[in-house]
Amino acid sequence: MAEKILVVDDDPDILDATTMILESQGYQVVTARDGIEGLAVLKAENPDLMILDLMMPKMDGFGVCKELQDPRWSKYKSTPILILTSVREEASRRRYELETGLELDVDDYIEKPMSPDTLISRVNTLINKKKS
C-alpha cells in the first residue's frame, strides 16, 4: 500500500503542484488548506508524513507544531513533519531554524519555490527514516 502524505497549504497552486509531484512517485496524497483543517485530516487519515506550510490563515504551521506537542496528540509524535517556508533572509532563517528545529520538533524544511527533485528527495528520506 502506498504511503500517505498530508499536505497542508493555503495556496491552491502549491497544493496542486505538490500533490501532482508526490502522486507521480506513487504516494497517496490528502490535503488541507489551513492548520485547523490539517489537524482534523491528520486525525482522520493518520498519514505517514505531514508537509506543512508555515504561513496560513486560521492556524499557521507554528501553531500546528505547538498543538502537536500537547499530550492529546501523542499518537502522532512519530509522524515526520516537513515544513514549507518562504523564509529567505538570514535573520528570518535563523529565527525559523531556532523555533522550528528546537522548539517545534520538525524533521526538515524546504524553501518555496521548491524544485520537484528536492521535494521528492526530502520526502523519500523522511518516509524511509520513519520505516526504519
Functional labels for PLM-detected ranges:
Residues E45-I51:
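Active-site beta3 strand of CheY-like receiver
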Residues D9, D53, T85:
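Active-site residues of response regulator receiver
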Residues M56:
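Receiver (REC) domain active-site loop signature in two-component systems and cognate sites
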Residues D34-E37, D60-L68:
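Acidic catalytic/metal-coordinating carboxylates
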Residues G26-R33, V41, I110:
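Short hydrophobic/Thr-rich beta-strand motif most characteristic of the beta2 strand and flanking loop
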